[in-house]
């Protein structure tokens, strides 16, 4: 790539000496130059100049190539107008020369020497130039021309020139390529020709690319699965080791210590005895519940006394500890330990024993006998004390309902 300084110098040179057109064909805005003569040429003509060889024409790009200072000085020393005027001033110049003849001539050699001298800062003169004795190289002749008759030199020369032009055109075509692109040449690679098997090659390359991507993804998946399995295995082994340690500390070690100390059999026997006692207690309680259910009686921990004895004892204690001035009904109601309730199965009132909670259908008879026992006990107590008190007459059974406050 040309530097900014190079572009600036070339821009200044372009506007001078008819350098804005191609020296060979007159095309506008040329982008290539022949540094050897300081002339500006187009892309097509630059290809033809390359065919001449670098000893006759050294071609450079204005924008794409790097430049040296000596090359920029040659561009200042030369130019399109200067080269044309110099060629026309020479005696051996022929306007009908071909490209090969023109640049292999003595006039072109003199101008090349002049450009080099001016670029190097030397003075140049036609008389002192070493190009005065320039001899153009003989053009190549075809093998068929060797057998031509020497009496036809002009035709042989014309044929050789035509053959050289054909060879030059073929060489130019090799540089430009089959596409004929205007910008194909030095610094611009021509596009490759498409072949019939390009489609197959592209398909195979796509297949290979897809397979390589698949193998890459599979390898990544396998590596990720391996890492996951390794991590899971490490965690599982860690948990198993923790569980084994806990089992060893909490179960195996205590059992082993007890076996060593001889306490394991004591613990087993105590556990069995406790279990047997629990089973025995549950069995006895169940048998007692079944017996109670079928007998219809609730059994307490101790046998309850008879009803008459209970009433007698309660009445005796009451008469000994209570005032005799109270009426019979008030004394009976306050001192009676049993509660009077109505049986749900009959209309009779029964006296419930506090110890056993039994029901009796003969409640009125028991109540009557209890009253008689209480009266007799009261008389005996009074006689022992030596004090005579009037005993109220026994109230008939049927009159008891009128005195109760229901």
UniProtKB/Swiss-Prot annotation:
Organism: Homo sapiens
Residues annotated as domain Arf-GAP: 7-124
CDD domains on file: ArfGap_ArfGap1
Name of the featured protein: ADP-ribosylation factor GTPase-activating protein 1
Zinc finger (C4-type): 22-45
Gene3D superfamilies in UniProt: Arf GTPase activating protein
Annotated SMART domains: ArfGap
The encoding gene: ARFGAP1
Domain of life from the UniProt record: Eukaryota
GO terms under cellular component: cytosol; Golgi membrane; synapse
Start and end residues of each stretch annotated as Disordered: 297-406
């Amino acid at each position: 790539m040309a530097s900014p300084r190079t572009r600036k110098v070339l821009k200044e040179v372009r506007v001078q000496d008819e350098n804005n057109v191609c020296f060979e064909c007159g095309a506008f805005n040329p982008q290539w130059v022949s540094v050897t003569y300081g002339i500006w040429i187009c892309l097509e003509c630059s290809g033809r100049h390359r065919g001449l060889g670098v000893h006759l024409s050294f071609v450079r790009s204005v924008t794409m190539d790097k430049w040296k200072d000596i090359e920029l000085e040659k561009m200042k020393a030369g130019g399109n107008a200067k080269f044309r005027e110099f060629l026309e001033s020479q005696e051996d110049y022929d306007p009908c020369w071909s490209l090969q003849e023109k640049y292999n001539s003595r006039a072109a050699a003199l101008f090349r020497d002049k450009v080099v001298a001016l670029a190097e800062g030397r003075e140049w003169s036609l008389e002192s130039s070493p190009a005065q004795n320039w001899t153009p190289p003989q053009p190549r002749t075809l093998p068929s021309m060797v057998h031509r008759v020497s009496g036809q030199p002009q035709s042989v020369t014309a044929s050789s020139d035509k053959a050289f032009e054909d060879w030059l055109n073929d060489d130019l075509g090799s540089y430009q390529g089959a596409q004929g692109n205007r910008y194909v040449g030095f610094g611009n690679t021509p596009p490759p020709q498409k072949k019939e098997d390009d489609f197959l090659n592209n398909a195979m390359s796509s297949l290979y690319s897809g397979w390589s991507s698949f193998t890459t993804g599979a390898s990544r998946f396998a590596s990720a699965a391996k890492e996951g399995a390794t991590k899971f295995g490490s965690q599982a082994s860690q948990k198993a080791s923790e569980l084994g340690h806990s089992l060893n500390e909490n179960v195996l070690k205590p059992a082993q210590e007890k076996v060593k100390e001889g306490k394991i059999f004591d613990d087993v026997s105590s556990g069995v005895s406790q279990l047997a006692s629990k089973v025995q207690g549950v069995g006895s309680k169940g048998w007692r519940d079944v017996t109670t259910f079928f007998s219809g009686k609730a059994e307490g921990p101790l046998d309850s006394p008879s009803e008459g004895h209970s009433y007698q004892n309660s009445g005796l204690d009451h008469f000994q500890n209570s005032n005799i001035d109270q009426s019979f009904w008030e004394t009976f109601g306050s001192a009676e330990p049993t509660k009077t309730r109505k049986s749900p199965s009959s209309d009779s009132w029964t006296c419930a024993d506090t110890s056993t909670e039994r029901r009796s259908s003969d409640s009125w008879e028991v109540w009557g006998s209890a009253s008689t026992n209480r009266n007799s006990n009261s008389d005996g107590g009074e006689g022992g004390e030596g004090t005579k008190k009037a005993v109220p007459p026994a109230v008939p059974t049927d009159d008891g309902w009128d005195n109760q406050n229901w």
